[in-house]
Amino acid sequence: MRRMRFSPRSSFARTLLLIVTLLFVSLVTTYLVVLNFAILPSLQQFNKVLAYEVRMLMTDKLQLEDGTQLVVPPAFRREIYRELGISLYTNEAAEEAGLRWAQHYEFLSHQMAQQLGGPTEVRVEVNKSSPVVWLKTWLSPNIWVRVPLTEIHQGDFSPLFRYTLAIMLLAIGGAWLFIRIQNRPLVDLEHAALQVGKGIIPPPLREYGASEVRSVTRAFNHMAAGVKQLADDRTLLMAGVSHDLRTPLTRIRLATEMMGEEDGYLAESINKDIEECNAIIEQFIDYLRTGQEMPMEMADLNSVLGEVIAAESGYEREINTALQAGSIQVKMHPLSIKRAVANMVVNAARYGNCWIKVSSGTESHRAWFQVEDDGPGIKPEQRKHLFQPFVRGDSARSTSGTGLGLAIVQRIIDNHNGMLEIGTSERGGLSIRAWLPVPVARVQGTTKEA
């Protein structure tokens, strides 16, 4: 059987737990110190004084310091009873007077027995006003002595409890606020690191907090600046290469237009190659631009899918739809999602047999859209590499393409905090489903097929 262990993972929870534990240990230690060095000695002194009073009340003669004995008159004894509030009860009367609700304390009985020199039973009755001590000694085994502690009130402990609770809450609240302030730079750093992972370079972070955190933030800013410079250099290089490639391609196209009619088939073949080269260059540029920050807005996913379906449908291509009826409002960059859907449809058209199905829906706080084809599919062990740049399945080796179409889709969906799933379509081909986060309150309608 697996053992369950409580182990907080975040530094916030660990630090707060450590402070609360230290505070609890400090309170327990303080309690033990006060108990052993203040309360117990006072209690022993109280027992000693109480024992003197009981001995004086239970005996007829008192021994003074010089050794002489003094006879205690009954009137003097009664006056002491009245001043101290002490009452004497038989066993039956004591039960009726509250002894039945009193609790026996062994350590008090033991200490009182030592003071009185014989067996003694001590009980404490706790009532609403003040506690009462009941004693029965060997000096008068049939009599219970009732001693009210009128100077001690139940309400006296309430301020102590409230002050202790207030101190604990203030300490925990202060610790929580301190840790939150200390961890705020780390939260900003985490958010910025996630953006860099998506290809979005945030502005330099403000360096604040502890010296170690400032050092990490400074190093992260240097790293982000280096990554941004590298991305800018790559984009500039690709733009220059594409410009330099398009110039000779344009000259080649002009040369084909000046070719004679007898070379028309050759000119047509050259023009197709030129168009393919231009398409490859455009895909390279699209891939580089995909990682840039995109402004998000609330848009209808079904409307975006409908625009792509209308643009990609043709007499040689059958696109079936199973879109959820109504509106699916998603926070997105519509142009990027449109590009992702178009790439998925083009991929299905290229490797399928003219059957494509586009569907959409919602499930568990998420919206999804899916593109299926009836092609040969792809082996399960190759699916995890399908969205990597320049990677294509075995069935696509003989077809044209750069292998960047689905890589662009992956980057777009990642920038929307979504995810991609690969499966098998209803006709045995490839199925690609994209999930996007969406509030449940913005989902309406049911699925309808066309």
UniProtKB/Swiss-Prot annotation:
Topological domains annotated Periplasmic: 36-158
Segments in the Cytoplasmic topological domain: 1-15, 180-450
Keyword S-adenosyl-L-methionine (UniProt): no
Domain spans labelled HAMP: 180-232
Compartment list: Cell inner membrane
Membrane topology term: Multi-pass membrane protein
SMART domains found in the cross-reference section: HAMP, HATPase_c, HisKA
Keywords for the protein's UniProt record, in alphabetical order: ATP-binding, Cell inner membrane, Cell membrane, Kinase, Membrane, Nucleotide-binding, Phosphoprotein, Stress response, Transferase, Transmembrane, Transmembrane helix, Two-component regulatory system
E.C. number: 2.7.13.3
Phosphohistidine: residues carrying this PTM: 243
Gene3D superfamilies from the UniProt entry: 1.10.287.130, Histidine kinase-like ATPase, C-terminal domain (3.30.565.10)
Binding site for ATP: 243, 347-351, 373, 392-393, 402-406
Zinc-finger keyword on record: no
PROSITE patterns: HAMP, HIS_KIN
One GO MF term attached to the UniProt entry: ATP binding
GO CC annotations, alphabetized: plasma membrane
Record domain Histidine kinase: where: 240-440
Domain comment, as recorded: Has several major domains; the N-terminal cytoplasmic domain is followed by 2 transmembrane helices that anchor the protein in the membrane; the periplasmic domain between the helices interacts with MrzA. The cytoplasmic C-terminal domain has a HAMP domain joined by a flexible linker to a histidine kinase domain. The HAMP domain by itself is intrinsically disordered. The cytoplasmic dimerization domain (CDD) forms an osmosensitive core and includes the autophosphorylated histidine residue.
Assembly mode: Homodimer.
Name of the featured protein: Sensor histidine kinase EnvZ
Gene that this sequence comes from: envZ
